[in-house]
């Protein structure tokens, strides 16, 4: 059975952020992930991790103004210096928190910029980040996201992600494969994860439709969990879903699959 990490941006939101670490540990999780750590000091978060015996699995590079609808800046030609500063900030946090991977959100395709320039910017930024992170012993992952939830999101399918990875040409760049997003965009989940096991360093989950916990929608998670074991996936699976009711009430799927 895969190792599951609680996504604290979406789970245990009944409590303040720093209280969610203890809640996750009490629920049986051994790892955590979330969108961003930057509203808190790395020392504050590290103390919560240590107090609750949790592994910091992943967080994202700074992604612009989230409250204003930005969803990454890596493909934006006029934000390169901001992106590079964000890489340095992420490294500083990861070196304290102990995670060995960070995720890059491409962002929403900018209006009035030609496709070639957008792609060139994204590739160059990924190359810069992959090299800087590699020097710090940290892997870079990038996530394809469906364009129904985030219209215009630049990186939105596996084939595109693999093409971008080839252009970057770094052995330190991997895929974060989000089962929910890719079910919407392309399906064929098991075959894709099998074919690209070597390029996938992190997986996230939610059911579809609704982005709720496994067992509430169309995805056969029992099969997929067993499939990940069969193909030898060694990474974490981040639980990035919206509980249908409360977090605690929606954790039955973990017990059903003997995951906690």
Regions found by a protein language model. Give the residues of each.
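Short, contiguous strand/loop micro-motifs
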Residues: 7-8, 31-33, 76-78, 113-117, ...
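Short phosphate-binding/catalytic loops that engage adenosine nucleotides
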Residues: 29, 54, 138, 233
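Anion (oxyanion) recognition and catalysis
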Residues: 25, 50, 95, 130, ...
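Histidine-acidic metal/acid-base catalytic patches
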Residues: 1-28, 38, 89-92, 98-100, ...
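Active-site loop signature of alpha/beta-hydrolase-fold enzymes
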Residues: 64, 147, 182
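Active-site acidic/histidine proton-transfer and metal-coordination neighborhood
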Residues: 73-174
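Hydrophobic residues in well-ordered beta-strands that form the structural core
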Residues: 56-58, 142, 177, 239
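Structural motif corresponding to the early beta-alpha repeats
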Residues: 15, 30, 34-120, 243
């Amino acid at each position: 059975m895969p190792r599951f990490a609680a996504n604290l941006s979406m789970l245990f939101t009944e409590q303040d952020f720093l209280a969610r670490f203890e809640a996750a540990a009490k629920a049986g999780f051994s790892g955590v992930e979330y969108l961003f750590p930057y509203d808190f000091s790395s020392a504050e978060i590290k103390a919560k991790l240590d107090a609750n015996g949790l592994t910091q699995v992943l967080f994202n590079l700074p992604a612009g103004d989230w409250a204003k609808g930005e969803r990454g800046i890596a493909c934006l030609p006029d934000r390169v210096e901001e992106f590079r500063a964000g890489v340095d900030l992420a490294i500083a946090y990861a070196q304290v928190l102990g995670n060995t991977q960070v995720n890059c959100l491409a962002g929403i395709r900018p209006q009035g910029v030609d496709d070639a320039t957008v792609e060139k910017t994204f590739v160059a930024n990924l190359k810069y980040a992959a090299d800087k992170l590699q020097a710090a012993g940290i892997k870079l992952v990038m996530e394809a996201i469906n364009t129904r939830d985030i219209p215009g999101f630049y990186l939105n399918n596996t084939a595109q992600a693999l093409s971008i990875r080839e252009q970057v040409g770094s052995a330190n760049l991997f895929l974060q494969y989000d089962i929910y997003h890719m079910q919407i965009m392309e399906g064929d989940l098991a075959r894709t994860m099998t074919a690209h096991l070597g390029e996938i360093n992190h997986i996230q989950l939610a059911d579809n439709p609704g982005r709720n916990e496994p067992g509430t929608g169309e995805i056969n998670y029992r099969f997929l969990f067993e499939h990940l074991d069969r193909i030898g996936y060694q990474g974490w699976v981040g639980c990035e879903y919206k509980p249908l009711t409360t977090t605690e009430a929606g954790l039955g799927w973990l017990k059903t699959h003997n995951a906690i």
